Amino acid sequence: MKNKAFIGVIAASLVPGQAAMAQNKAVKATADRPNIIFILADDLGYGDLSCYGSKTIKTPNIDKLAATGTRFNQSYAGSGISSPSRCALMTGKNTGNSRIRDNMCTAGGMTGLKITPEGDTTIVRRTSLQPQDTTIATVLHAAGYKTCLVNKWHLDGYDPKSSPIYRGFDEFHGWLISTVESNSPYYYPYNRFDNDKLIHIKANEHDKHIKHNTDISTDDAINFIKRNKKNPFFLYLAFDAPHEPYIIDNTTWYDDESWSMNDICLRTSTA
């Protein structure tokens, strides 16, 4: 079992309905259940990947997964924005039938602070997944899987009791909307959750760019896998990158190109 894994890499969302199918099959689970690793890249367009024809951006590791797996040519997100798409992914419902249909809402939900990339704050209203909402994590947990979410949940609104550990995940390592201290800055975070405990990242104090969120998330994911070698597990690894163009940590691959990285960032920001 520990040598078998299903790995999915996706830029947006799971096809709605798969969580519901998993619920029907959970009672038939056998000892030969595969491990499941689901990797989500935030705001990554399929045209940005080399394996889908991009001539600009180099994605060698994703290309390796594509070469040994299956590429989908007609796979659609539940929504074009973050929270509704993640809600469709977690519940298996299309956006028209799911609880979360926008990043913000005008009625219901809870209000809280939102921090912009520039560090400004504003008050917004968000809704969250409720205890009665079945997620793929609750289904797999009931089937005997160890479940873990690493990094971005984005389905908690401003309710601390709607974090991943209250929605089917045994472990959570990442940041929450409901806690301002953990959701900014995104890429060199000062704080981060370990289940329901807020951990301070001393290395990034005073705007020091020492521990990148992608590296922290990768380490958390690897450690979860190591701890669960003998268990069937479901790992949902939801990276922030490449959500914003300014998070690029190393651009030396592109030093010899005729275009500049600023050109790419400008096109991304204005698209």
Describe each PLM feature range.
Residues 8-9:
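Sec-dependent N-terminal signal peptides
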Residues 2-4, 13, 20-271:
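Formylglycine-dependent sulfatase
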